[in-house]
Structures are given as C-alpha cells and as structure tokens.
C-alpha cells in the first residue's frame, strides 16, 4: 500500500511539473496523495516507538516479577506453606528445591534442600523415599487418624478400598512397631502396593520379610486382599 501511494504521488508530481497549466483537479489529487504518504510514514514511526516502549515495559515488568518471586521464595517460612505436611511432589517442595532456592540461598524453611521423592534416600536401612519431617513426635491417636485419612484419599480406587478396609479392621489394635511399618508402606506407590497385595508382582527385598512371613503385617494384608470370607466391602467413613 505504501509503495503504491509513493508511485502515485511521484506520477502526479511529474505531471504537475511538466504541465503547469494542468487542471486544478490534478493538482489537488497530487496534494492529497502527498498528504496521505506523509501521514502513513508518521503513523509507522509512532507505531515503532510505541512497540519499543511496550517491549521495554514488558521486559522491566518481567524482571520486577522475577525479583519479587526470588525475594518471596528466599524468605519462605513453614507457616506460609499451603500444607504443614507436604507430600513428596507438592508444589511447595518443588519450589523450595529448585535451582534458585536451594538451602545455599539462605532459606529459612526446614524443607529446603530436602528431596522427599528421591530414591537415593534411606530410612532405617531401607532404600525408600525420605520420610516427611515433623512426624516423629506424633501422638498415637493423631497417627491413626492420619493413616485412616491417607488410606481413603490416595486417589487410586482399588488401593484405597484395600487399604482403608484393612485400616478400619486392624489399625487401632496394631502395636506401635506395626503402625510405623504400615505408615512406611503408605509411602510406596499405589500400584506397587496393589500388585504386591494381589501377588501380581514380586515383592521387593525391603518388604519380602513382611509379605512372605505368616502373621506379619504384609502377609495379613495379602490375606485381607484375597478376601476368603467373600465379604462385601465399601469405603469406610472417615
């Protein structure tokens, strides 16, 4: 469009110069074309300036946002987390363990630098994800209530049904050692627990003694899954 206007303006200018006695209409057309050309160029220049200022503003806003986020993460406290006991893949844990927010950055949270989902962590000489800190001093009643909730709200229907009905039947009568063992079992992936209970996958070495020894917690869980009494089961209330 701009090239067409320039060409037309030049033609009118040449015609006006070679024909001084040309009609007034031709002269007015040339003036209109030149005015359009100058207006178009002015608009393009102003548009470039506006785009440049917008880009500068966007860049400044992004840098301010990053600085604000960095300052916020660098001063994260435990009482500001969305969950006082975050799960391994909680967004809070992911943020606290990102490259820019490691423990070397001076974070005040006890969760910084702790990768709860790491398979390299060990617990009681068992190669398993690290336990969520802060649960060592739980009262027995609090632990039982938490475990009942965890068995009902894991997210996999098959595993939820097996674990929650087992918890309703046995959890309150378990000794503290087996209660802690059941707590550690819930740290394992849902489908792994389901396949171990249904004997569709080999039991790993860390749980072999519990699942293969009669009377142990894992062995009783397999018997509960087998449901020899053919009982009708449904999700218990919380």
From Swiss-Prot:
Gene3D superfamilies the UniProt entry points to: Flavinator of succinate dehydrogenase
Compartment(s) where it occurs, according to its Swiss-Prot or TrEMBL record: Mitochondrion matrix
Keywords, sorted A to Z: Chaperone, Mitochondrion
Region: Disordered, residue numbers: 47-82
GO annotation, cellular component aspect: mitochondrial matrix; mitochondrion
UniProt keyword Chaperone, yes or no: yes
SUPFAM superfamilies, A to Z: YgfY-like (SSF109910)
Pfam name, any one: Sdh5
InterPro entries (alphabetical): SDH (IPR005631), SDH_sf (IPR036714), SDHAF2 (IPR028882)
Record's keyword annotation contains Chaperone: yes
Major site of localization recorded for this protein: mitochondrion
GO-annotated biological processes: mitochondrial electron transport, succinate to ubiquinone; mitochondrial respiratory chain complex II assembly; tricarboxylic acid cycle
Biased composition (Basic and acidic residues): 68-80
Function: Plays an essential role in the assembly of succinate dehydrogenase (SDH), an enzyme complex (also referred to as respiratory complex II) that is a component of both the tricarboxylic acid (TCA) cycle and the mitochondrial electron transport chain, and which couples the oxidation of succinate to fumarate with the reduction of ubiquinone (coenzyme Q) to ubiquinol. Required for flavinylation (covalent attachment of FAD) of the flavoprotein subunit of the SDH catalytic dimer.
PANTHER family referenced in this protein's UniProt entry, alphabetically: PROTEIN EMI5 HOMOLOG, MITOCHONDRIAL, SUCCINATE DEHYDROGENASE ASSEMBLY FACTOR 2, MITOCHONDRIAL
Misc remark: This protein may be expected to contain an N-terminal transit peptide but none has been predicted.
Recorded family membership: Belongs to the SDHAF2 family.
Oligomeric and partner information: Interacts with the flavoprotein subunit within the SDH catalytic dimer.
Protein name: Succinate dehydrogenase assembly factor 2, mitochondrial
């Amino acid at each position: 469009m701009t090239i067409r206007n320039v060409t037309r303006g030049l033609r009118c200018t040449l015609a006006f110069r070679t024909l001084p006695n040309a009609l007034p209409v031709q002269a007015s057309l040339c003036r209109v074309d030149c005015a359009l050309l100058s207006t178009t160029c002015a608009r393009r220049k102003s548009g470039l300036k506006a785009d440049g200022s917008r880009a500068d503003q966007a860049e400044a806003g992004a840098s301010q946002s990053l600085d604000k986020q960095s300052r916020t993460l660098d001063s994260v406290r435990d009482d500001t987390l969305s969950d006082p006991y975050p799960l391994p893949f909680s967004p809070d844990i992911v943020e606290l363990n990102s490259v820019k927010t490691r423990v070397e950055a001076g974070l005040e949270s006890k969760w910084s630098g702790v990768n709860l989902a790491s398979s390299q962590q060990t617990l009681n000489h068992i190669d398993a994800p690290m336990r969520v800190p802060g649960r060592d001093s739980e009262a027995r009643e609090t632990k039982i209530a938490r475990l009942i909730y965890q068995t009902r709200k894991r997210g996999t229907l098959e595993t939820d049904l097996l674990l929650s009905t087992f918890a309703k039947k046995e959890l309150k009568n378990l000794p503290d050692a087996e209660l802690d063992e059941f707590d550690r079992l819930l740290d394992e992936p849902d489908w792994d627990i389901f396949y171990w209970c249904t004997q569709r996958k080999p039991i790993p070495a860390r749980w072999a003694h519990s699942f293969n020894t009669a009377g142990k917690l894992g062995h009783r869980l397999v018997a509960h899954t087998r449901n020899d009494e053919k009982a009708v089961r449904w999700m218990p209330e919380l």
